[in-house]
Amino acid sequence: MKVNTLPLAAITGQEAVKLALTLAAVDPGLKGVAIAGRRGTGKTVLARGLRHLLPPIDQLEGCPCHCNPAEPHSWCNRCRERFTEESGLSDSEVPVVQRNAPFSEVPLGATEDRLLGAIDVEQSLAGGVRAWQPGLLGEANRGVLYIDQLNLLDDGLVNSLFDAMSGTCRLEREGISVQYPSNFVLIGTYDPDEGGLRGHLADRIAMHVSSGVIVDLEQRLEIMRRQELFSEAPEDFFDLYNDEQEQTLRRIEKARTVLPQVTISEAQTLYLIGQSLKRGVPGHRADLFSVRLAKAHAAWQGRTAVEPIDLAVAVEFVIKPRQTVDLPDEEEQMQPPPPPPPPPPPPEPDKPDDPETPPDEAPKDEQTLQLPEEFFFDAEEVPMEDELLSLQNKVQRQARGGAHGKQKSLERGRYARALLPPPGKNSRVAVDATLRAAAPYQRQRRESGQYGDRQVIVTNSDIRAKQFVRKSGALIIFVVDASGSMAFNRMSSAKGAVSVLLNEAYVNRDKVALIIFRGQQAETLVPPTRSVELAKKRFDQVPVGGGSPLAGAIAQAIEVGVNSIGSDVGQVIITLITDGRGNVPMDPQAGPKNREQLNEEILALSRLVPENGFSMLVIDTANKFTSTGFAKKIADAAFAQYYYLPKMTAASLAETVKSGVHALRK
């Protein structure tokens, strides 16, 4: 036996993940396990370790979809054609073989054809008929489908995967119409730092667990020792754990036999439902999964009745990962309420003026108020209230559910699918799809005698072009007013909000740039980058004060956007945070301008934003007593989204910009 994966029994620690994988093998109806963890925490090794713990299956002989002989209603088209009543075979005569349960892996760059299936070119060329071959979804039927970096899977493939998890996959393309079973256990691994799972997919997976970092020195040493032994002699190392693996496999087979007999009381079911309601879990799927998991755990333990420990496992693996409401700890619930706060101290009586005021010190109301020319404000902390976090998570889920971050192209990127060549455009030939399109017509074309002795006859109507997909995030250009007037409009809030937004951009794989304007000119403080720490560090050092070169800032933002568009930037979003009181012309050396001339210059530059294909968001921070309403005119000229935040806080600004940027995404 060729061994290329560690046995699950040899993996040190990660007991929760190993238990979840085992329970998925006990009850495939749980649909799968999602394993979250940072790089190097053993997610892939754990997932692949399940391969050797899957009990063998009986299947129809010669079926690539591993059709179940006991379920004729679910057979694929090929098996229905071979083993129907017309074939003359009775149920007892249908050829059945025993095979290892399949374990299929979906590479991140898989195409739709590889996932769903397509025309079998070899058989079609030989027979001159449209024959099909199943994709990875069909090959994984009654086994495991493993996807690494599940959160980064192409949106089109995710939608196909979502449909297939219903148990049946239908293929309608290239003149063929087939249906085949797709009952598999989905094991997905991902790094949460690179984004979470799409909501509709995560909801279909019963168990969500984490592979944590092992900090125990002895365990880490043991991990190194075992890995070295496995690298030197994989087969010998596997034999060391063969007995333990066999015991686990026999135990899983026994648990599958016991599972139909396991019962759960109504009170226990109500407890699980109550936990879902308490924790704000939406929908009913968590209730169904938690009951199934409690039964599976009881069967794994060899029992026919659910006990409290089974309920606890169900809550931990199914309900807690889906919760949207934080519950206080039991200890906190048992504590008496805190005592009322002490009354405020009485106000101090007005103190009489100090009779011994030095003669050279003038009274305060007669002193001239001296203001520094520059101010430094720390970034304000951003308290994220529950409602704010809920909205933030909703926006993130919506963003992940669409086609954000992807650009389709005929020239470069990852080959995703084939299509008819667009007229008038150069494209690359998709040889695989072209041959599949031509295959069914080979016999007919040879018999026509028009093509001589050619073995493979391809015509223009068969040609298919490659469509590529590449990552293409947005460039979010923060243009922040650091003039003197902003000092009194909560510059600290702006800094706090931008810090949050920089983190948001990092999660979405966007680039950020930071332009501040004060004094006589605008300055690109941070050119387009994905380095959040660099942007934060430089922004925290920005002083506030001086004039407001608003025109120069808009011009500089447009220039940065024009220079960045293309490559891995597919969209430019300019976020302007200002009170709209620009007072420095585009070219200060050209001489002073009156207010009307300044405003017209700013509006003319604002009109260039949509002309360059950019989007814009204007946050008006002007005090309602001093506002001129000019920021709204800027937004109108740029066809921008406009928000007025006179009582700006870091939290409100951050959420406003996040919502606005999400709405502007293409």
Curated annotation (Swiss-Prot):
Top EC class, one word: ligase
Domain VWFA residue range list: 475-661
Annotated Pro residues bias: 335-347
SUPFAM superfamilies: Formin homology 2 domain (FH2 domain), P-loop containing nucleoside triphosphate hydrolases, vWA-like
Region (Disordered): 327-367
Cross-referenced InterPro entries: BchD/ChlD_VWA, ChlI/MoxR_AAA_lid, Mg_chelatase_ATPase-dsu, Mg_chelatse_chII-like_cat_dom, P-loop_NTPase, VWF_A, vWFA_dom_sf
Keywords annotated in UniProt: ATP-binding, Bacteriochlorophyll biosynthesis, Chlorophyll biosynthesis, Ligase, Nucleotide-binding, Photosynthesis
Molecular function GO labels: ATP binding; magnesium chelatase activity
GO biological process annotation, one example: photosynthesis
Pathways per UniProt: Porphyrin-containing compound metabolism; bacteriochlorophyll biosynthesis
SMART domains: VWA
UniProt: ATP binding residues: G37, R38, R39, G40, T41, G42, K43, T44
Protein family per UniProt: Belongs to the Mg-chelatase subunits D/I family.
Primary role: Involved in bacteriochlorophyll biosynthesis; introduces a magnesium ion into protoporphyrin IX to yield Mg-protoporphyrin IX.
Protein name: Magnesium-chelatase 67 kDa subunit
Organism: Heliobacterium mobile (Heliobacillus mobilis)
Gene, per the UniProt record: bchD
